[in-house]
Amino acid sequence: SESILIVHQQQSRSSGS
């Protein structure tokens, strides 16, 4: 569960940049 949240945040950050 936590792993999924972390991955989602990392992906969102990459897209934002």
Swiss-Prot record:
Q: Which UniProt keywords apply?
A: Antimicrobial
- Out of the domains of life, which is the source? Eukaryota
Q: What does this protein do?
A: May have antimicrobial activity.
Q: What protein does this entry describe?
A: Putative antimicrobial protein 3
Lineage, broadest ranks:
Eukaryota, Metazoa, Spiralia, Lophotrochozoa, Mollusca
